[in-house]
Amino acid sequence: MKEVAVYQIPVLSPSGRRELAADLPAEINPHLLWEVVRWQLAKRRRGTASTKTRGEVAYSGRKIWPQKHTGRARHGDIGAPIFVGGGVVFGPKPRDYSYTLPKKVRKKGLAMAVADRAREGKLLLVEAFAGVNGKTKEFLAWAKEAGLDGSESVLLVTGNELVRRAARNLPWVVTLAPEGLNVYDIVRTERLVMDLDAWEVFQNRIGGEA
């Protein structure tokens, strides 16, 4: 990635706020983000939809009436697709929807998604979640101090299991471990909150793509 910009990202600590300079993509490519999201959603598809052909439905193959001299339309067996309960023509069968997306594209997409949140002022780094020990009310108190009031959806990325447990009951918070940070969850939420350990994991993952 050739175009890089220096973003000043706010860092929240028990002693107050400071800023951290970070090199991230200067330009956001919406199509590349779409490609990564499409790849992620394709991987998640179970691909279990299945229909029966006329050869698989539980009907006799006997011709339902003679070809001629009945005054009726010509038909074969009752399992033909034209009849209700008959087989399905070109219906879905179980399949694997996943495909390979180049690792370089995935890394660029992740870097761009985070850069987009930084550019919008929607990225917050956290030094420590002071006072949060696994209870939702503790997280709500911390969130209020951090300026998170539930009016925007938040993606919370931290390796601290107690913090994730405290936040996971809130409908406006999506929690992830640092290794699980992905483009789809970033773009489907409005704010991104990461602790410094998660930020370091992210930097190692994109490794020079920013």
Curated annotation (Swiss-Prot):
GO terms for cellular component: ribonucleoprotein complex; ribosome. GO terms for molecular function: rRNA binding; structural constituent of ribosome. Changing E56Q: Restores Ptase activity of hybrid ribosomes to that of pure E.coli ribosomes. Significantly increases binding of a tRNA analog to the P site. The N-terminus is blocked. Keywords: Ribonucleoprotein, Ribosomal protein, RNA-binding, rRNA-binding. Part of the 50S ribosomal subunit. One of the primary rRNA binding proteins, this protein initially binds near the 5'-end of the 23S rRNA. It is important during the early stages of 50S assembly. It makes multiple contacts with different domains of the 23S rRNA in the assembled 50S subunit and ribosome. PANTHER family: 50S RIBOSOMAL PROTEIN L4 (PTHR10746), LARGE RIBOSOMAL SUBUNIT PROTEIN UL4M (PTHR10746:SF6). Belongs to the universal ribosomal protein uL4 family. This is Large ribosomal subunit protein uL4. It comes from Thermus thermophilus (strain ATCC 27634 / DSM 579 / HB8).
